[in-house]
């Protein structure tokens, strides 16, 4: 019986403490009604930020993260938008325009820069009257985007450059796609067959040297 009375006494004591805490909180809110206003305002702003995040994600295809941070007990909300590409083709280009090489000096400069980066370069030797050359150029520019920062792509129009440059490449047929590395021509593909086969051969060529 004494044990049961003790349990009841403890329960009443605990309830009394909770009631006193509740009264203190109510008294604090009554004396400072701005606390409720700030909390409600903060919740409303949080909902607005999240709504705008969803709208932006639907429209732009971006992942949007909203971060809330309260420091040192202050009711201060810090918002930070962080946009990340949802599709890989947003982050990387789908095509890279090939740059022309106009003379031997430019070729030497290109090779020197590639040597410093320890990267190969691809050169399409072409002519404006060569239909196959014109057909391959945009496909090679797509391949250039695929190997961006690993290999650099160039072209030489043999009708617009000195013959010393053409002889440097030892060109006899067009289109000819060559891979150069460490100041030397390593391998080449003669593009007389189907375009997709040429591109695959060039890709295999690059993979051997990157």
From Swiss-Prot:
List the active-site residues: 130, 133
Thioredoxin domain sequence ranges: 81-210
Q: List the disulfide bonds.
A: 130-133
Which ranges does the record mark as transmembrane? Answer: none
Gene3D superfamilies to which the protein is assigned, alphabetical: Glutaredoxin (3.40.30.10)
As for subcellular location, the record says:
Plastid, Chloroplast stroma
Can you cite an annotated GO cellular component? chloroplast stroma
* Chief location of this protein within or outside the cell: plastid
What's the superkingdom here?
A: Eukaryota
Q: Which UniProt keywords apply?
A: Chloroplast, Disulfide bond, Electron transport, Plastid, Redox-active center, Transit peptide, Transport
Q: What does this protein do?
A: Probable thiol-disulfide oxidoreductase that may participate in various redox reactions.
Sequence similarity = Belongs to the thioredoxin family.
Q: What is this protein called?
A: Thioredoxin-like 3-1, chloroplastic
């Amino acid at each position: 019986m004494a044990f049961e009375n003790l349990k009841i006494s403890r329960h009443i004591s605990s309830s009394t403490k909770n009631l006193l805490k509740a009264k203190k909180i109510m008294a604090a809110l009554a004396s400072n009604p701005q606390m409720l206003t700030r909390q409600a305002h903060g919740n409303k702003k949080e909902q607005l930020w999240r709504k705008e995040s969803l709208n932006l994600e639907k429209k732009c295809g971006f992942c949007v993260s909203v971060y809330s941070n309260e420091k040192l007990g202050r009711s201060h909300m810090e918002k930070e938008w962080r946009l990340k590409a949802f599709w890989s083709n947003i982050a990387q280009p789908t095509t890279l325009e090939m740059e022309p090489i106009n003379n031997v000096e430019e070729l030497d400069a290109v090779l020197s820069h590639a040597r410093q980066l320890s990267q190969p370069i691809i050169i399409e030797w072409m002519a404006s009257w060569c239909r196959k050359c014109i057909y391959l150029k945009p496909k090679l520019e797509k391949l250039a985007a695929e190997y961006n920062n690993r290999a650099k792509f160039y072209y030489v129009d043999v009708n617009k450059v000195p013959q010393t440059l053409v002889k440097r490449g030892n060109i006899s047929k067009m289109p000819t796609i060559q891979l150069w590395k460490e100041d030397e021509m390593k391998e080449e593909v003669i593009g007389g067959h189907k375009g997709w086969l040429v591109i695959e051969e060039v890709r295999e060529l690059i993979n051997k040297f990157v």
